[in-house]
Amino acid sequence: LVIETITSRNKEMTDTVTSTGPRLNEPAPAFDAPTTDGRKTLEDYRGKWLILFSHPADFTPVCTTEFIAFAKKHDEFTAMNTALLGLSIDSHYSHIAWMLNIKEKFGVEIRFPIIADLNMAVAQAYGMIQPGASDTAAVRATFIIDPEGVLRAMVYYPMNAGRSVDEIHRLLVALQTADENQCAMPENWKPGDEVIVPTPATPEAAMARAGEGYNTVDWYFSTRAL
């Protein structure tokens, strides 16, 4: 009986983990959803990086500050072959009215589409609905999807704290740079900083590391400039 109870609990925990959303380095969930710029599918973004992000509700102050920040970095994201796509469980008409309000009150134009996820299909698929926060509103979730449709990063913020768009931009730059240079990025890496050289995979490679011309502290820790 004790074994059965533990097994049942473990299964419940596993089900909770696996059913709450996508996983890193796996294909991002497909979607086909109405937006402020017509219907959009994940396949529409094939060949580009995509930042898909949710917010709790239109016409709310924290969300407004986030959208203004995303809008101000829109051109920088575009230059990085990256599209922005917002989402909330509000109507298409609410999104449009809010976009116009932001332009009128703050002088900022929102030039990226927003999904009107009234049936919560996309939000559920991406684990944007967190029952501990709300059953009817998405939390502040951010997903970075690469040009092959693979989920490369995801970040969740609570309802009462706005996300850092600068950090999302930094993370995107780090992912793209790591892919292009076959390296890893240290804590708080920024363009111009040295990068981490992959750790040797064999004893022979570890022994040879010191003579390879990197900035080597020990066999497992080497950096280099790009």
Task: Put a short name on every predicted segment.
Residues L1-E12:
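Short, Lys/Arg-enriched N-terminal segments with co-localized hydrophobic residues
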